[in-house]
């Protein structure tokens, strides 16, 4: 048994019994750049050393969520606003995404995890679009867990794109005004077919949701930790889930 799996088993044994697990966990992976500044004497002098370290944290969290029985895990990797960063930093981030998609494909196959990417993928470099399409297609038949990366994602942008498509369907009489409902609007979103997140975790201590899944988190439990994303471990995920299980979810009632 791998060390990560041993840790996940220990975590499962220590969770409160009889309390429900979140079906869908979403994480705002914040704190990569602050981690880099904190460790700059040990880091390579590159703009995204913190992001590389953060990428190394992902497999442990995915393994833990999978072992616990979480159905969907959504990770906020790159926002629409991140395009305002320097061209060199953005280019390095896209290079990192490409290398991670290629190197981690066997990880997904071994665990039978389905990959999905949400956001306006049309604005990404063509090589990255191709790698996303290939990895998504190669894992589309898996059902143990769905791993969703939000790349060039912003919730307002998602809603604008959804409403444009909905308007086109109204104009072509594919749907009528009377068909419009919360469920119909949800079906036009990038997250169509996924349950809404039960738990949203934000690392790095900032108290905001940063234009992430605004429609979907209407009744989601929020958990903020000061731990920076590269330092976030399975034990930190356990603490978030324990806190979630201690809350009474009322769905706005």
From Swiss-Prot:
Q: Which InterPro entries match?
A: UPP_synth-like, UPP_synth-like_CS, UPP_synth-like_sf
> Which stretches are annotated as coiled coil?
none
Q: What does this protein do?
A: Catalyzes the condensation of isopentenyl diphosphate (IPP) with allylic pyrophosphates generating different type of terpenoids.
Question: What are the positions of the active site?
Answer: 30, 82
Q: At the top level of its lineage, which domain of life is listed? A: Bacteria
Q: Name the encoding gene, please.
A: uppS
Q: Which residues bind substrate?
A: 31-35, 51, 79-81, 83, 85, 202, 208-210
Q: Note whether Ribonucleoprotein occurs among the keywords.
A: no
Gene3D superfamilies from the xrefs? Decaprenyl diphosphate synthase-like (3.40.1180.10)
Q: State the free-text cofactor note.
A: Binds 2 magnesium ions per subunit.
The protein in question is named Isoprenyl transferase
Q: Would you identify the family this protein belongs to, as annotated? A: Belongs to the UPP synthase family.
* Subunit note: Homodimer.
Q: Name one Pfam family in it.
A: Prenyltransf
């Amino acid at each position: 048994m791998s060390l990560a799996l041993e840790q996940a088993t220990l975590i499962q044994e220590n969770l409160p019994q009889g309390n429900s697990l979140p079906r869908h966990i979403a994480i705002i992976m914040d704190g990569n750049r602050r981690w880099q500044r904190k460790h700059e004497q040990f880091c390579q002098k590159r703009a995204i050393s913190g992001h590389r370290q953060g990428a190394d944290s992902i497999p442990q969290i995915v393994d833990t969520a999978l072992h616990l029985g979480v159905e969907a895990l959504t990770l906020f990797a790159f926002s629409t606003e991140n395009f305002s960063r320097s061209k060199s930093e953005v280019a390095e981030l896209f290079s990192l995404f490409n290398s991670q998609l290629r190197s981690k494909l066997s990880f997904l196959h071994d665990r039978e995890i389905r990959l999905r990417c949400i956001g306006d993928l049309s604005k990404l470099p063509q090589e990255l679009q191709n790698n996303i399409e290939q990895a998504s297609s190669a894992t589309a038949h898996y059902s143990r867990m769905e791993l969703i990366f939000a790349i060039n994602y912003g919730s307002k942008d998602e809603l604008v794109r959804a409403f444009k498509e909905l308007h086109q369907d109204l104009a072509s009489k594919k749907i009528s005004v009377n068909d419009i409902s919360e469920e119909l609007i949800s079906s036009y979103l990038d997250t169509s077919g996924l349950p809404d997140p039960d738990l949203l975790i934000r690392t790095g201590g900032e108290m905001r949701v940063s234009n992430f899944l605004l429609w979907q988190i209407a009744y989601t439990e929020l958990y903020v930790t000061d731990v920076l994303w590269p330092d976030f471990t399975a034990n930190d995920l356990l603490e978030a889930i324990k806190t979630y299980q201690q809350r009474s979810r009322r769905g706005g009632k």
